[in-house]
A protein has these predicted regions:
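Amphipathic coiled-coil alpha-helices
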Residues: 21, 87, 101-104, 131, ...
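Juxtamembrane interface at the cytosolic side of transmembrane helices
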Residues: 2-13, 126-154
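Residue-identity detector for glycine
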Residues: 14-15, 21, 30, 48, ...
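Extracytoplasmic/periplasmic regions of membrane proteins
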Residues: 36-124
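Generic hydrophobic/packing signal
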Residues: 18, 22, 61, 67, ...
Length: 154
């Protein structure tokens, strides 16, 4: 049974780290491109009432986050500042066939739609973050692997 020298083991571990790091970077880049493409395909433009980036196409983490904020603010304003809980409480106190109940149900539906849209946009923001983290980790692995491969007997 032959044993590997410590230097040979370091070189092998370095090679594995470089391979793993390269894979992390490649997969992260692919994920970033996929998320960006899907956001672009939706053809969403940040509306004029956005605090920043109004008129820009939603295609990156910043524009997706700004769009989510705008949706939240518009939904709250459209519901008169009411939350789902407020609307549910109000619905219990009115006749189900009244105009007020219809309006409350419309507000509830609008809040629900807005929550769904915001969740989708914030999920893309999170996916961008995970992708960037994985790419950074991959780059670190490549650097460490390179240093391990350069190790010599001194």
């Amino acid at each position: 049974m032959t044993s590997l020298s410590p230097l040979s083991t370091l070189h092998r571990v370095g090679g594995l780290a470089i391979a793993a790091g390269s894979l992390f970077v490649a997969v992260s880049a692919g994920a970033w491109v996929t998320i960006t493409k899907q956001l672009r395909d939706e053809k969403i433009t940040v509306p004029g009432n956005a605090p920043v980036l109004a008129g820009k196409r939603v295609q990156d983490p910043v524009t997706a986050y700004v769009e989510a904020l705008v949706i939240k603010n518009n939904a709250e304003r459209g519901a008169g500042g009411r939350t789902f809980a407020d609307i549910s409480d109000a619905l219990r106190g009115v006749d189900a066939s009244s105009d007020e109940a219809r309006e409350l149900r419309n507000q509830s539906s609008a809040l629900s739609t807005a929550a769904s849209l915001r969740t989708s946009l914030l999920t893309s923001v999170l996916a961008y973050g995970v992708s960037a983290f994985a790419a950074g980790l991959g780059a670190f692995f490549v650097l460490v692997g390179t240093q391990l491969r350069r190790a010599d007997d001194k």
